[in-house]
A protein has these predicted regions:
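Glycine-rich nucleotide-binding loop
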Residues: 95-97
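C-terminal nucleotide
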Residues: 1-91, 101-138
Length: 138
């Protein structure tokens, strides 16, 4: 099931960006397809570090394909999360809205994330939600 979920997500992104006419689309398309394979293999092999590397690389590729995917505030939030509370971050959603997806460091609670965001980034209306999807894998 994980393979299907991630293949669907990444391949939908590939379609969107390939059709956008962006000069970086072809490179992004190729890299995201490779990344999809790496991500699926990381789940199959229970390789948490590689999984996180794939998520982080995904975010970088999205920003490369379209600078509109992020801005300085989102980049700062992502960098701070990676430093203090998360092992991986990426963005999800559509233009004008969305959310920052984070794979939390071991032992970090959702309350700690909420407090961290409120203190370090008070301009962000945080509605942190915790979804435990990978417990059975790791």
């Amino acid at each position: 099931i994980w393979e299907t979920v991630f293949a669907f997500l990444f391949n939908n992104l590939i379609y969107i960006y390939t059709c956008s006419g962006n000069k970086n689309s072809l490179f992004g398309h190729t890299e995201i397809r490779r990344l999809n394979d790496r991500l699926v293999n990381s789940i199959r092999q229970s390789d948490y570090e590689e999984f996180c590397n794939c998520i982080n690389r995904h975010f970088e590729l999205l920003k490369f394909i379209s600078p509109l995917v992020s801005n300085s505030k989102i980049d700062k939030l992502s960098a701070d999360c990676l430093e203090f509370v998360a092992d991986a971050t990426s963005v999800c959603g559509a233009g004008g809205g969305g959310y920052l997806f984070a794979v939390l460091k071991e032992g970090v609670t959702i309350n700690q994330v909420e407090e961290f965001i409120n203190q370090k980034h008070p301009y962000i209306k945080s509605h942190a939600k915790q979804i435990q999807l990978l417990d059975e894998i790791w």
